[in-house]
UniProtKB/Swiss-Prot annotation:
PANTHER family: BLR4935 PROTEIN, OUTER MEMBRANE CATION EFFLUX PROTEIN. Residues 1-48 form the signal peptide. GO terms for biological process: response to cadmium ion. It comes from the Bacteria. Belongs to the outer membrane factor (OMF) (TC 1.B.17) family. This is Nickel-cobalt-cadmium resistance protein NccC. InterPro entries: OMF (IPR050737), OMP_efflux (IPR003423). Keywords: Cadmium, Cadmium resistance, Cobalt, Nickel, Plasmid, Signal, Transport. Pfam families: OEP (PF02321). Transmembrane segments: none annotated. GO terms for molecular function: efflux transmembrane transporter activity. The gene is nccC.
């Protein structure tokens, strides 16, 4: 019980939707309402249906999400291919029966049986080139996995924050509906006392209907965002709540000296270019003759004696010197280099854009918070004036809409900040909202 109360108190103190340093009437304090809604939604399911804190969910998803498991299998396959590339060529066993059915010579059979083993050898560095290709392909697979991990972390962070924002919008919509119902009650009382025209009741009822529609849409948005988060994280059951806040989380510090080459996309493109470059060496050595050394024994049919045989085999690159194969490999390297140059430019632009977006969202959040404080104060004054019969209902409804819009802007600003920070972490090659690189 103490842990629950402590968690509730923490939400009241630090929830991102609360206007700071502002005294408001009890019915206008949106942050506690939103905090209670989040707490109830988060603690409503203590079982597996509740999404764990983001850091825990990220580590679980990196190990268990189907998307990550696919790439992990690809890395293991590339590692197995690299190990297989080191294998030596297998020897070949041959048996040859000669002079079957041939006429006897002096009453003796002319049959001869030959048994031999041929061991092929890769000369001219063919084996070393093949091993290098396997290693480069393995490094490229690892780079692709690292890029996928970084991209996945950014996507998961945005999905988690989007679900949290949906809960905030739902709590805001429920509070807006409650305020609309209170205004309708006050309007009916004023109409009954003759202080307002009957039209005011219709206007207040229309406001309630609009608030009900907004609340229904917000509830639907919560369901869809939780379904998206569940599918992305690989959960077998849809989550019914979240257990921590990411909208108010402080990001990991960006390490100094980060360059464009630290981008996972650049590293992946560079690793793929290196793999194609290693393949060129393989193609250039493909025409080198295949050499084999043969040793065996020949048994003569007319006696019990045997003779030994030794041989050397080699292919002759007379018609095929693999010129076109070499040209194709060289062109693949050129294409990979062009992709690397393009990715490097895009990564540089993406990082500059992410840095700019982070700075912009910080300013946007500060402005939205100030606007929310002003709108809350305006609604407080307008509500007191309406209850005293000094403020028209139309003006009160407009002020409440402005308050809802201001709180909505605060939620949107916090979500935009998470998106920008996730994009910056992605550009820097870091897991979003994690210290690790």
């Amino acid at each position: 019980m103490g842990a629950v109360l402590k968690a509730e108190a923490n939400i009241f103190r630090s929830h991102p939707f609360r206007p700071m340093n502002q005294a408001t009437p009890k019915k206008l304090r949106s942050a506690p309402c939103i905090g209670v809604a989040l707490l109830l939604m988060a603690t409503g399911s203590i079982q597996a249906a509740e999404a764990p804190p983001y850091s825990v969910l990220l580590q679980q998803s990196l190990a268990m999400a189907p998307t990550m498991m696919v790439q992990a299998a690809n890395v293991r396959a590339a590692g197995a291919d690299a190990a297989q590339a080191r294998a030596w060529l297998n020897p070949r066993f041959d048996t040859l029966a000669e002079n079957l059915g041939a006429p006897s010579s002096g009453g003796q059979s002319q049959r001869q049986n030959t048994y031999s083993i041929t061991q092929p050898f890769e000369i001219g560095g063919k084996r070393g080139a093949r091993i290098e290709v396997g290693e480069r392909n393995y490094e490229a697979a690892q780079a692709r996995e690292r890029q996928l991990r970084v991209n996945y972390a950014a996507e998961l962070a945005v999905a988690y924050a989007t679900a949290e924002a949906a809960f905030g919008r739902q709590a805001l919509a429920e509070e807006n509906l409650a305020l609309a119902n209170e205004e309708l009650t006050v309007a009916r009382a004023l109409v009954e006392t003759g202080k307002e025209a009957t039209l005011r009741t219709a206007q207040a009822q229309a406001s309630v209907s609009a608030a009900q529609a907004i609340e229904a849409a917000a509830s639907s948005d919560v369901t869809s965002t939780l379904a998206r988060l569940s599918a992305l994280s690989g959960a077998t059951e849809a989550y019914t709540g979240i257990s921590s806040s990411l909208l108010s989380a402080q990001p990991a510090m960006t390490p100094g000296g980060t360059t464009t080459d630290d981008s996972p996309a650049v590293r992946t493109a560079e690793a793929e270019r290196n793999a194609f470059d290693a393949q060129v060496n393989v193609e250039r050595k493909r025409w080198i003759p295949e050499v084999g050394i043969t040793a065996g024994v020949r048994r003569y049919g007319w006696s019990n004696e045997s003779g030994y045989i030794v041989g050397l085999t080699a292919s002759i690159p007379l018609f095929d010197r693999n010129r076109n194969g070499i040209d194709a490999a060289v062109q693949r390297v050129a294409a990979a280099q062009a992709r690397l140059d393009t990715v490097r430019l895009e990564a540089n632009a993406a990082r500059r854009s992410a840095v700019s977006q982070v700075a912009a969202t910080d300013k946007q959040l500060a402005a939205a918070s100030q606007g929310e404080q002003a709108a809350s104060e305006a609604y407080r004054v307008g509500r007191l004036g309406y209850e005293a019969g000094k403020t028209p209902l139309v003006e009160l409804l407009a002020v409440r809409r402005a308050l809802v819009d201001a709180r909505q802007l605060t939620i949107d600003a916090r979500l935009a900040r998470v998106r920008a920070l996730a994009a910056l972490a992605q550009a820097d090659g870091r897991l979003a909202f994690e210290e690790s690189r």
